[in-house]
């Protein structure tokens, strides 16, 4: 399977997982060959989806940060036969945790 098809499949799989968690998320779109967001529907969060067996997480986070445009960059990733994981910068995790702890919506 080529990397574009595998990427699309990963994005669709993660969007489905998000919907199962109660969030109205769908796969993003590409326009004129330009990359858009991998998935949309999580306000304030920029999601980079990686569905690979070997992942350079620092490269993936750098890509998400580069494309985030003011949103919190995360990487949603998983291997075959494994659960979805979310990786994000520690400072962003603490920002979300403080908001949750204070009872605020992020």
Language model features: what each stretch is:
Residues 1-106:
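Catalytic phosphate/metal-binding cores of nucleic-acid and nucleotide-processing enzymes, i.e., regions
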């Amino acid at each position: 399977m080529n990397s574009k098809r595998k990427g699309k499949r990963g994005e669709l799989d993660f969007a489905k997982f998000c919907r199962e968690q109660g969030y109205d998320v769908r796969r993003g779109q590409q326009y004129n060959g330009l990359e858009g967001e991998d998935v949309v529907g999580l306000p304030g969060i920029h999601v980079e989806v990686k569905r690979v067996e070997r992942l350079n997480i620092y490269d993936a986070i750098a890509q998400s940060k580069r494309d985030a445009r003011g949103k919190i960059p995360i990487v949603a990733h998983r291997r075959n036969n494994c659960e979805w994981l979310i990786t994000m910068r520690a400072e962003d995790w603490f920002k979300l945790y403080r908001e949750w702890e204070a009872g605020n919506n992020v």
